[in-house]
Amino acid sequence: MSKKPIVLKLGKDAFGDQAWGELEKIADVITIPESTTREQFLREVKDPQNKLSQVQVITRTARSVKNTGRFDEELALALPSSVVAVCHTGAGYDQIDVEPFKKRHIQVANVPDLVSNATADTHVFLLLGALRNFGIGNRRLIEGNWPEAGPACGSPFGYDPEGKTVGILGLGRIGRCILERLKPFGFENFIYHNRHQLPSEEEHGCEYVGFEEFLKRSDIVSVNVPLNHNTHHLINAETIEKMKDGVVIVNTARGAVIDEQAMTDALRSGKIRSAGLDVFEYEPKISKELLSMSQVLGLPHMGTHSVETRKKMEELVVENAKNVILTGKVLTIVPELQNEDWPNESKPLV
């Protein structure tokens, strides 16, 4: 068995070489081939002759799901008893079912704070673009419709921020960053809906309303909730029908929070006037009909796709792994495990 604790690094990073180099001074960092399948992975972590069966800390990126599949109950049960922590490179961790890891006393960590600014910037870009029909104008410009199609390439008029009610679905870290970024543009009316009302000092002047009222009052629906069994298809045909005619929807959270077919139908009918989307329900597979709609301003999940943010995320994942080795505990344990006693009983690996 290795003298150093074994850290399994799943997925590639872009800016973390220096941090990983430092970790290798105290850990044996191993990887798996790019061609690895879930079946191979599940088989090899159970093989006592394979180094994977001795792993103690796992780090993972979202893209590594192509090799391992979801971190679900089957995978959690297959992992060797030596595993004490899974460290995910992202704020959203819907690829991980926390409960089976909780049952095995395996800590799960994410990177909750570092993505807020970059994601909020992306959200505001999409919101303003969808409100002003910039996506339509961009498409028509590229298609060569100017000047023949008239002013603005014949794009429909957009709308200004004044007088519009922005409904923030999920006023958490990212939601508050979006709120503060929107105020200088002239937005004045903000409402929000969370499962529970926040303390007034955390509301930043945003009015708490019930879900039904939220749907009825919002001119713009800003989606910022994590994806879980409670929020899957939270926006669906029934809830869309309760929204204002001509509502604008912006989503930089997770695609499956919205029933994509219901949204597509509503865009086609005009119930939803436009949408700004950085995430999609079945990404990277995207509905051809949705992509063909000029009123959809879409991005290929670029919310945290900046040098500075990505570097910080990758470095924090390494810090989580390092902290497990030196103290037994991750730095940023996910909310579902924050009230558990057993992580505090974890021992250093060296």
Swiss-Prot record:
Annotated positions of the Phosphothreonine modification: T31
Disulfide bridge map: none
Entry binding sites for NAD(+): R173, I174, T252, A253, R254, D278, H301, M302, G303, T304
Active site: R254, E283, H301
Main location group: cytoplasm
Catalyzed chemical reaction(s): glycolate + NAD(+) = glyoxylate + NADH + H(+); glycolate + NADP(+) = glyoxylate + NADPH + H(+); (R)-glycerate + NAD(+) = 3-hydroxypyruvate + NADH + H(+); (R)-glycerate + NADP(+) = 3-hydroxypyruvate + NADPH + H(+)
Coiled coil: none
Alphabetical list of InterPro entries matching this protein: D-isomer_2-hydroxyacid_DH, D-isomer_2_OHA_DH_cat_dom, D-isomer_DH_CS, D-isomer_DH_CS1, D-isomer_DH_NAD-bd, NAD(P)-bd_dom_sf
Pfam families tied to this protein: 2-Hacid_dh, 2-Hacid_dh_C
Phenotype when the gene is knocked out: Leads to higher biomass concentration after diauxic shift.
Top enzyme class: oxidoreductase
Location(s), subcellular: Cytoplasm; Nucleus; Mitochondrion
GO BP field: glyoxylate catabolic process
Family affiliation: Belongs to the D-isomer specific 2-hydroxyacid dehydrogenase family.
Protein role: Glyoxylate reductase that reversibly reduces glyoxylate to glycolate, or alternatively hydroxypyruvate to D-glycerate, using either NADPH or NADH as a cosubstrate. Does not act as a hydroxyisocaproate dehydrogenase even though it also has minor activity on alpha-ketoisocaproate.
Note: Present with 3280 molecules/cell in log phase SD medium.
Protein name: Glyoxylate reductase 1
Lineage: Eukaryota, Fungi, Dikarya, Ascomycota, Saccharomycotina
